[in-house]
Amino acid sequence: NETVFAEDPYLLFDVFRYAQQHNLKLSENLKRIIRKNLPLLKDFKWESKDLKEFLFSLLNAKNSFKIFQAMHEVDVLGLLLPEFGKCKFQIHNDYFHMYTVDVHCLQSIEKLENLHFNSEKELAEFSSVYQSISRPEILKLSLLLHDTGKAEGTDHIETGLLYLDNIIKRLGLEKREAKTLKFLMKHHVFMNHTAQRRDLSN
């Protein structure tokens, strides 16, 4: 059915959940059908609780990167999180980032998740800390969104925080979740400075 997602938008959630749970890739035909239906979904109003539950279920899994990359490839991620969609193909204006903003944010999640399976001695402590985090989905969401403010070409942290306010309302996040996300967004550049100028083993 070529219009199946327009008839029932929530089937999109089922497709990506199933693909993640069974470690499957989307077929080219399914990608085509999803893309074809996107214009019909742009004005659809997702329920906050359903959108939050869907995104957090994906973020709670160990392979969030793969499924978010697949969602981004067919522009579903930008449909659900327009703030992220704005930074697609956006180039960083510095010497430190090799990839576009969208790819950088997704790869940040990949690097974090790789710590779970880490076997390198020098990363053992970081791996242990990561596995002790009680709400990894919040940390991953902050990574996904941390540079989205660069889409406007202004102060990306200030813009990112404005974007984040909209996302917090749209997802209906709890006060503690919102506070943590804002803290991570506001101070993420400090992590960059620390990584470049400090001995992380000290």
Regions found by a protein language model. Name each.
Residues 13-16, 106-109, 161, 165:
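Predominant activation on well-ordered alpha-helical scaffold segments within soluble catalytic domains
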Residues 73-89, 93, 99-143:
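Active-site-adjacent "gating/activation" loops or surface patches in catalytic cores
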Residues 1, 23, 116-120, 147-152:
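Structural motif corresponding to the C-terminal cap of alpha-helices
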